[in-house]
């Protein structure tokens, strides 16, 4: 079963970004996919700022990302840029850390103008790490939150629909990638079998 790593790049607690990340992952778990969560705010700040990849907690976080089949990244947008916390983590990753993976970028913010940070700020960085595919990004405006006495109850219908559709599209990409890998494996096995048969015939 494919493993998805959901990465929260928010330094805040409580965090609207983390809540949106959980909502985005709900359709994925409903499809039977395994989703693990990594909250970057729980990593040691000094190790991140010093780019100390040898720190046990940081090294474990990097290893979890590299082992995942797909990644959902969620970040708040500050001054038209993704969070510094997420940047320090991405800077620690190997050049091709996302190779073969499907990535879904999410962002939250207080202005629709901040949505540009996804396509012009975060996406180019992700593409430089050689992912198999980057799904359509979703920006969630803070005013779309529906809150009750116990916190976030959900999102406005239009926003929730966009988020659910993005999650479903992301899962479809992951399924397509897995199917492609299986087909390639089958073709390779057939070629190896054909070569072996040809060799046996020549030997006979």
Identify the role of each PLM range.
Residues 53, 57-133:
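Helix-loop-strand module that forms the ligand-binding subsite of alpha/beta enzymes
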């Amino acid at each position: 079963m494919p493993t998805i790593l959901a990465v929260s790049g928010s330094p805040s607690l409580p965090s609207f970004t983390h809540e949106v990340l959980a909502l985005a992952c709900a359709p994925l778990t409903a499809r039977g996919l395994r989703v693990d969560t990594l909250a970057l705010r729980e990593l040691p700040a000094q190790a991140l700022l010093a780019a100390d990849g040898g720190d046990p907690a940081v090294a474990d976080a990097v290893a979890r990302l590299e082992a995942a089949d797909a990644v959902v990244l969620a970040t708040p947008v500050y001054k038209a840029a993704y969070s510094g916390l997420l940047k320090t983590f991405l800077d620690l990753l190997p050049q091709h850390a996302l190779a073969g993976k499907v990535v879904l970028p999410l962002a939250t913010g207080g202005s629709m103008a901040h949505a540009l940070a996804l396509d012009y700020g975060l996406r180019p960085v992700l593409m430089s790490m050689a992912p198999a595919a980057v799904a359509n990004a979703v920006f969630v405006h803070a005013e779309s939150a529906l809150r009750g006495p116990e916190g976030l109850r959900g999102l406005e219908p239009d926003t929730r629909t966009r988020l659910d559709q993005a999650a479903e599209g992301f899962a479809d990409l992951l399924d397509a990638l897995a199917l492609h890998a299986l087909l390639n494996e089958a073709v390779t096995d057939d070629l190896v079998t054909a070569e072996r048969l040809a060799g046996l015939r020549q030997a006979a």
